């Protein structure tokens, strides 16, 4: 085989020929500081790598296909953290320090627990304790206001919207969840309850087909769901005018699938909106950063353009993740540095 001919049958040989580890300063998972992290994040000899890959793969990307899809306007909505959120993030920082020093047993607390709690705090503190107050300026409430505005503007054409949230899905167990909270607020503001649906209620293929039909006709105008249940295979684009991302997954493909629900053939709208909601100074920044690292890695390979000899730059999609990371960190100098990095990359 080609790998045997080129003596690349072992991963170490392949890695030394095509890759390099790089060390970069990145946000710590607890969101309160920075750390140096070494990762495999740079490719060399890309033309040779891609010619080998194309022996077994045929790559077609969106920029090659020129499909008649709506133009998407991306908007990052940054919510200021409440004092309570700031306190809770600081508490996570202490937990992370204890875990890192080994003073806490992994069965009691670990970084996975800290990360999950960090995601919850960034979304809504009531996920940590339902008795805590509802912050009127939270990203959840800002999202509700945006949904209401677009719902009102699209009444005549019965335009529809999707809300993605992988955390706090409805379980019907009486506990607080953001799905029920959003619906309650929309109904209180005048949206008919029958126009709001959860994908989780369609638990059979027949129910799902009926629900999708209602969204396409505009009878259901606000549909909430998770990436797993409302990602691939959800064909409801006919009247879709906006998608709202209340949280972010770990894989770039998750965001591609989410946005693919609206940036799709068969949409009557020429322009659509994609909202990314982040809470400044919380784990949101770390999550977008993780996504950026993964997207950069993928983008260097899955491109329709002729690859350069080596690559570590970010593409447009990855750059939007970088911008969000800077906005979230609450430090404008990070954003300025990233903008300068991009300019330097272009000049090179």
Language-model regions: role of each:
Residues 2-133, 149-152, 274-342, 346:
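Inter-lobe coupling linker of SF2 helicases/translocases
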Residues 76, 160-162, 221-222:
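Residue-level preference for the first positions of well-ordered beta-strands
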Residues 103-114, 156-180:
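Conserved strand-helix element at the start of the C-terminal RecA-like helicase core
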Residues 167-200:
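Conserved helicase motor "Helicase C" RecA-like lobe of SF1/SF2 P-loop NTPases
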Residues 192-227:
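Conserved helicase ATPase core of P-loop NTP-dependent helicases/translocases
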Residues 235-248, 273-276:
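A short beta-strand element within the Helicase C-terminal
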Residues 251-269:
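Conserved SF2 helicase motif VI
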């Amino acid at each position: 085989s080609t790998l045997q001919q080129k003596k690349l049958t072992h991963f170490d040989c392949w890695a030394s020929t095509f890759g390099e580890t790089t060390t970069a300063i990145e946000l710590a998972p607890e969101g309160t500081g920075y750390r140096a992290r070494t990762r495999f994040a740079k490719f060399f000899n890309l033309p040779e790598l891609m010619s080998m890959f194309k022996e077994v793969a045929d790559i077609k990307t969106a920029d090659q296909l020129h499909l008649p899809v709506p133009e998407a306007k991306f908007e990052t909505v940054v919510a200021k953290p409440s004092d309570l959120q700031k306190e809770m993030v600081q508490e996570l920082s202490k937990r992370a320090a204890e875990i890192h020093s080994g003073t806490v047993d992994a069965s009691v607390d670990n970084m996975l627990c800290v990360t999950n709690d960090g995601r919850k705090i960034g979304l809504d503190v009531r996920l940590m304790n339902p008795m805590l107050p509802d912050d009127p300026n939270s990203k959840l409430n800002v999202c509700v206001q945006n949904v209401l505005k677009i719902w009102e503007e699209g009444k005549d054409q019965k335009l529809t919207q999707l809300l993605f949230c992988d955390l706090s899905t409805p379980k019907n167990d009486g506990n607080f969840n953001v799905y029920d909270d959003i619906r309650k607020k929309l109904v209180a503001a005048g949206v008919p309850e029958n126009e709001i649906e959860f994908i989780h209620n369609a638990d059979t293929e027949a129910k799902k087909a009926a629900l999708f039909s209602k969204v396409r006709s505009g009878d259901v105008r606000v549909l909430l769901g998770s990436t797993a249940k409302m990602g691939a295979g959800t064909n409801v684009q006919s009247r879709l005018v906006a998608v709202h991302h209340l949280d972010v997954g770990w894989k770039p493909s998750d965001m591609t699938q989410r946005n693919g629900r609206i940036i799709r053939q068969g949409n009557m709208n020429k322009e659509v909106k994609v909202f990314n909601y982040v809470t400044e100074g919380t784990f949101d920044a770390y999550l977008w950063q993780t996504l950026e690292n993964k997207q950069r890695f993928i983008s260097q390979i899955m491109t329709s353009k002729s690859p350069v000899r080596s690559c570590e730059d970010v593409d447009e999609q990855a750059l939007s993740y970088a911008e969000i990371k800077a906005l979230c960190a609450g430090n404008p100098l990070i954003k300025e540095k990233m903008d300068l990095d991009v300019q330097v990359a272009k000049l090179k």
